[in-house]
Structures are given as C-alpha cells and as structure tokens.
Amino acid sequence: MGKTQILWGIAPIGWRNDDIPEIGAGNTLQHLLSDIVVAGFQGTEVGGFFPEPAILNKELELRNLRIAGKWFSSYIIRDGIEEAAKEFAAHCQYLKDVHADVAVVSEQTYSVQGLDKNVFKEKPYFTDEEWQRLFEGLNHLGEIAGRYGLKLVYHHHLGTGVQTEEEVDRLMAGTDPALVHLLYDTGHAYISDGNYMNILEKHIDRIRHVHFKDARLKIMEKCKREGNSFQQAFLQGMFTVPGDGCIDFREVYQTLLKHGYSGWIVVEAEQDPDVANPLEYALIARKYIDRHLLNVPATN
C-alpha cells in the first residue's frame, strides 16, 4: 500500500443518530465540528443532517477538517442494479463535492438493524442467487465510485446479510478486488463472532477504511439475554469508544501498521448523547489513542 499514512476521524453518530433523528437533535453541525476540533481529530463522516456541499465545505474549512466518507444503503437485491446505481451516482457526486475518499456501502435488503427484532438471532441470510446479484451489483457500484475518484468500501454490519466472518469471506471472494474494498469495523466483528482479528488478518489487503468501535461486554451479554433490537442495544450502551470497552485496539493497530495500512481510522460509537456526552467520549478516545497506540513503537 506504500508509505503508511493514517488519518484519524470520529463519526457524527455520537452527537446525532440518523436512525433515531430525535436523539441529539439539539446538536448542530457547528457544535459537532467544533467538538471534533477540540478533541484533536482530523475529520469526520457525513451524517444524515449534514447540509449541501457548499455550506458544509465552508464549515469544514473554518476548522481545517476533512470528510472521510458517507454511508449508502444499497438495495441491490430488492430493487435491482439499475435503481441502486442511479441513487449511488448522486451519492458519489455529493462525496466528490465535499472531497471525500470513500463511499461506505451496506446492503440493506432484509436488514433488521432498524426494526424491532432480535439483532442477535434474527439477522437475514441471502440465497445463492441473491449473493450473485449482490456481487454483480457491488462490482458495478465500485466502477461508479471510481469515476468520481472514490473507493467503495463495504461495511459488514449487525442485522444484515453480510455480518459474520463467513459472510465477509464470501463477499470478498465473490467481488472484484479492484472495485470492492472492505470497511473493517472492530465492534461489529466482535459482537457478531466474538473475534475481531480474523477478518482483519484474512482481508487486510482489501481493507481501505476502518472503524474503531468498542463494546461493553456486560451490556452486550445483557442485550443478548434480553433479545434486544439493534437500536435497543445501542441505547442501552452496548457500544462505546476505544478505551472504554473490552476490545484491545493495540493488536488491531499494530496489525494495520505492519501491513502498511493507509487511510482513515474513524472512531464510531452509537450512543445516546444525553447519557454519553459526545465531547467527553471523544476525548476519552483521543486520550486512549495518544497513550496506547501512537506512543507505542510499531512491531515487525
């Protein structure tokens, strides 16, 4: 991958949540971006409440911040490639206009992440024919992303058809490495499979974007016992920032360095901002990164 250059970002989801818009509704764009500067991060991802590019770019330039990417919910299996491609092209135009690097894609056909269903036991599964449609569709979206100077990075996610290590393996095997890359998310890997290193080590050559999401073990176990939905689980505090949960990010970070990873590492943790003050938790993450990751020599 060439010389390692890592950019550190933090996602807006700690301030406001796209799935539950009333959460953190009082946190303005200016408030969010200024908090990110105070916490010492270099950028963020686009939230659902972010404005048109001209307005956003002005706010970013005032604070010397950058945009890493933005989530795109694809429905390739449900709606077909042509419909998904049309929506994705508009998505990529926005990302190009805000000078982003990646387009984050997650196939949402049959997803339960926004439903009142047990996210631990009621995830969807694709048929062989649906997998093939997904492969073809993602390759096509990857071509579109490239035309806009972007990389398509696929987000494995709880409650979707591409969640488990086995499903990530299948996605990587079935798609073109030049067109479809991987967003590696520590929290989703850990909660899904109880292991966050396997996906990283197996697919390091496909990883072009990283989310550092931590998990609170006791709350996760409680949510599993209660059969919580995805939204119920994060509102109870299942997710948190690095340094406040049970994931050892030192091993993850050293592996990324060893393989010459270049790109964004974005801290991301769905939490209720009325319970977990966004700036406070951004600073917890920043302190952990500075003390336990950046001040440790790289291992061979």
From Swiss-Prot:
It catalyses: scyllo-inosose = 3D-3,5/4-trihydroxycyclohexane-1,2-dione + H2O. Keywords: Cobalt, Lyase, Manganese. Pathway: Polyol metabolism; myo-inositol degradation into acetyl-CoA; acetyl-CoA from myo-inositol: step 2/7. It holds the Pfam family AP_endonuc_2. Its cofactor is glutathione; Co(2+); Mn(2+). One of its GO terms (biological process) is inositol catabolic process. Its EC number is 4.2.1.44. One of its GO terms (molecular function) is myo-inosose-2 dehydratase activity. Belongs to the IolE/MocC family. NCBIfam families: myo_inos_iolE. This is Inosose dehydratase. The gene is iolE.
